[in-house]
Amino acid sequence: MEKFLKYEIKVNNEQARANPNYGIFEVGPLESGFVITIGNAMRRVLLSCIPGASVFALSISGAKQEFAAVEGMKEDVTEVVLNFKQLVVKISDLLFEDGEMVEPPLERWPLLTVTAEKAGPVYAKDLECPAGFEVVNKDLYLFSLQTDKKVTVNVYVKQGRGFVTFLENREMINSLGIIATDSNFSPVLHCGYEVQELKTSKQKITDHLTFKIATNGAISAVDAFAMAAKILIEHLNPIVNVNESIKALNIIQEKAEERRVRSFAKQIEELDFTVRTFNCLKRSGIHTLQELLSKSLADIREIRNLGKKSEREIIKKVHELGLKLRS
């Protein structure tokens, strides 16, 4: 079968070091049509399927429900809830197993807590986090106290994917005074791609794909890009595995330079020399094609017990491979 072009990924490492939350990834060359196939699939997965963490509920001392007002607090509870929904939190995979921070019993939930007693603003950096939790956007404004008064806010955070409404989150809550919120788990804020057509020859037109990805800091753009591809691959692998012969099929065309490097690494056993020629080469310390090509014709003629017939065989084999001995 005609093989598909092998493409490359270019990552702007300098830009990634300056701002890991934003990434530009160049993919190409791709055969015509594949830019839309890959671009759309990657974009959909990046925007909806990358796992993350989000606030799903909170409790405020002195407030029984979201339409209340708390004495001494500048904002009403609805405004405070909207501010807390913008929290970006990372949960360590090292401390929590898969699914552990999705639906544990509410009474055992690790809480992010802030207690304010003095008049003034309160920010995300003031939150006390349990082990394994980290607030990313520490400068996020949460609320202000207009007078000296003790107010405590407990924040419930869980892992998930996509978007979950407060109605769905409320089903987990069986306690008065805990206010459910909407949850946006996706750490990817923006993902777009651009297509550039490249004419590589009279008959061949290839496309170039450029992804631009921005995240909220809970995951780097590079990690999100790789994670999206991993999710797609894991979903497609079972389909490939339906047919073992197809599974083993190589459909991507190697570049000429890669084929050249791979052929150089061939053992001389793979070159189908006659026994006499093979033994002479082995005894002289030549084990790979690369070692053979490093020899000149004069070097070959000096190999002990190597006759004219074997010499001609070596020259012919090298020519068949489109190569030549050292001059």
Swiss-Prot record:
Lineage top rank: taxon: Bacteria
GO molecular function, one term: DNA binding
Alphabetical GO biological process terms: DNA-templated transcription
Catalytic activity, reaction form: RNA(n) + a ribonucleoside 5'-triphosphate = RNA(n+1) + diphosphate
Stretch list, region Alpha N-terminal domain (alpha-NTD): 1-243
E.C. number(s) listed in UniProt: 2.7.7.6
Keyword Acyltransferase set for record: no
Record keywords: DNA-directed RNA polymerase, Nucleotidyltransferase, Transcription, Transferase
Region: Alpha C-terminal domain (alpha-CTD), residue numbers: 260-327
SUPFAM superfamilies (UniProt xref): C-terminal domain of RNA polymerase alpha subunit, Insert subdomain of RNA polymerase alpha subunit, RBP11-like subunits of RNA polymerase
GO cellular component: cytoplasm; DNA-directed RNA polymerase complex
InterPro entries: DNA-dir_RNA_pol_insert, DNA-dir_RNA_pol_RpoA/D/Rpb3, DNA-dir_RpoA, RBP11-like, RNAP_asu_C, RNApol_insert_sf
Gene3D superfamilies assigned: 5' to 3' exonuclease, C-terminal subdomain, DNA-directed RNA polymerase, insert domain, RNA polymerase, RBP11-like subunit
Signal sequence range: none
Enzyme class: transferase
Domain remarks in the Swiss-Prot or TrEMBL record: The N-terminal domain is essential for RNAP assembly and basal transcription, whereas the C-terminal domain is involved in interaction with transcriptional regulators and with upstream promoter elements.
Protein family membership: Belongs to the RNA polymerase alpha chain family.
Family annotation (NCBIfam families): PRK05182.2-5 (NF003519), rpoA (TIGR02027)
Function: DNA-dependent RNA polymerase catalyzes the transcription of DNA into RNA using the four ribonucleoside triphosphates as substrates.
Subunit relationships: Homodimer. The RNAP catalytic core consists of 2 alpha, 1 beta, 1 beta' and 1 omega subunit. When a sigma factor is associated with the core the holoenzyme is formed, which can initiate transcription.
Protein name, as recorded: DNA-directed RNA polymerase subunit alpha
Species name: Mycoplasma pneumoniae (strain ATCC 29342 / M129 / Subtype 1) (Mycoplasmoides pneumoniae)
Taxonomic placement: Bacteria, Bacillati, Mycoplasmatota, Mycoplasmoidales, Mycoplasmoidaceae
Encoding gene per record: rpoA
